[in-house]
Amino acid sequence: MKINMKIFIFLTTFQYLIDIQMYPCNNIKGNLILYIHHLVDIYIYFGGFLFNPLYHLIVVIITLLHWIKNDDKCFLTEWSNSICYPEYTEYKGFNDFSRMLGIQDKYPTISYYYLGFVILYDLNKI
């Protein structure tokens, strides 16, 4: 397995394990959706550095359009929340590294700025 794929799997699994320690999910289907969400999240944030920047650019643009169209909410977050955390009546943001470190709470739009940065990076690498 190539080093980039190992880094990707490590970051995904590490983030997922921290997440389920903070917010346990007691549902097998919910855990599968949550792990897939962590895969997508790590790809969005690091995929351009690890893999093909053109494919990454396409995924990032689709993600941004989805967030904008869906009132800054991710369908994967809503889906996993409905299965793992039905007690939350309001939207519970996805627990990724930036939220775990308190960055999302201090700078709620930081994801948009970071994705703007990775778009510029991807365009430079294409």
Listing of model-derived features with the role each one plays in the protein:
Residues 8-17, 39-42, 58-68:
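Hydrophobic alpha-helical cores of multi-pass transmembrane domains in eukaryotic membrane proteins
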Residues 51-77:
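Hydrophobic alpha-helical membrane-embedded segments
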Residues 34-46, 108-121:
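Core segments of transmembrane alpha-helices
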Residues 17-26, 68-72, 123-126:
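Juxtamembrane "helix-exit" motif on the non-cytosolic side of transmembrane helices
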